[in-house]
């Protein structure tokens, strides 16, 4: 090999090494930028996983390319031992980065599995609470002889079941629950305002809905019998 050929080869190797150096710098910058944002949300974490997988594939492909070019360089020039060591260093660095990405992917997988378990526990808790609420409503209806409807927004109507075979009209009372304090918006038969005030004051003081409904039924029954 002539000196000119060796110099030309050395220039090519230096240029190749510079390209590798710039590629790794850009890789490190890209990874550092993406690492700052992938914790923002669950959807971002999933996107990050896919991006990391793509980057991992790129690194693996680039590693293969480097190894092929390195082997070719070894066959062409045995004099560039120093450059060969640099290639080995770059390859080891790429392998280290790939292992780091594998660890990051494992961490994200674990985090997503934990979040999935948390969501499942929350779902089960809500289902349990919903079942509990339904059972409490059914208990009220059984104990007090009534059924409950919510035909209007923020309003609950309690229809009292008759203890006799034929009672007309049906006894009922409607509570507005949209405000901090309850309000009686309707009843059948119509309750005097003084009785409404007394019922609402007792409910506000005790927060005992069962006692409120018993008292309301008693007043409504008395008004029905009086007519």
Curated annotation (Swiss-Prot):
Pfam families: Spindle_Spc25. One of its GO terms (biological process) is cell division. Keywords: Cell cycle, Cell division, Centromere, Chromosome, Coiled coil, Kinetochore, Mitosis, Nucleus. One of its GO terms (cellular component) is nucleus. Residues 40-125 form a coiled coil. Component of the NDC80 complex, which consists of NDC80, NUF2, SPC24 and SPC25. This is Probable kinetochore protein SPC25. It comes from Kluyveromyces lactis (strain ATCC 8585 / CBS 2359 / DSM 70799 / NBRC 1267 / NRRL Y-1140 / WM37) (Yeast).
């Amino acid at each position: 090999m002539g000196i000119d050929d060796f110099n030309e080869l050395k220039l090519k190797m230096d240029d190749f090494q510079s390209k590798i150096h710039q590629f790794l710098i850009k890789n490190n910058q890209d990874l550092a930028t993406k690492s700052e944002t992938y914790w923002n949300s669950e959807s971002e974490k999933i996107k990050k996983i896919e991006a990391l997988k793509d980057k991992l594939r790129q690194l693996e492909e680039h590693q293969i390319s480097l190894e092929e070019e390195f082997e070719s360089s070894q066959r062409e020039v045995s004099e560039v031992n120093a450059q060969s060591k640099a290639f080995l260093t770059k390859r080891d660095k790429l392998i280290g980065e790939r292992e780091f990405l594998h660890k990051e992917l494992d961490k994200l997988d674990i985090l997503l599995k934990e979040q999935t378990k948390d969501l499942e526990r929350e779902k089960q808790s809500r289902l349990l609470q919903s079942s509990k609420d339904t059972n409490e409503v059914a208990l009220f209806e059984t104990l007090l002889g009534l059924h409950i409807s919510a035909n209007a927004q923020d309003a609950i109507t309690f229809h009292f079941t008759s203890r006799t075979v034929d009672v007309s009209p049906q006894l009922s009372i409607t509570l507005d629950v949209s405000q901090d304090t309850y309000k009686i918006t309707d009843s059948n038969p119509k309750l005097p305002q003084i009785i409404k005030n007394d019922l609402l004051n007792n409910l506000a003081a005790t927060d005992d809905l069962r006692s409120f409904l018993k008292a309301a039924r008693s007043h409504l029954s008395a008004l029905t019998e009086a007519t």
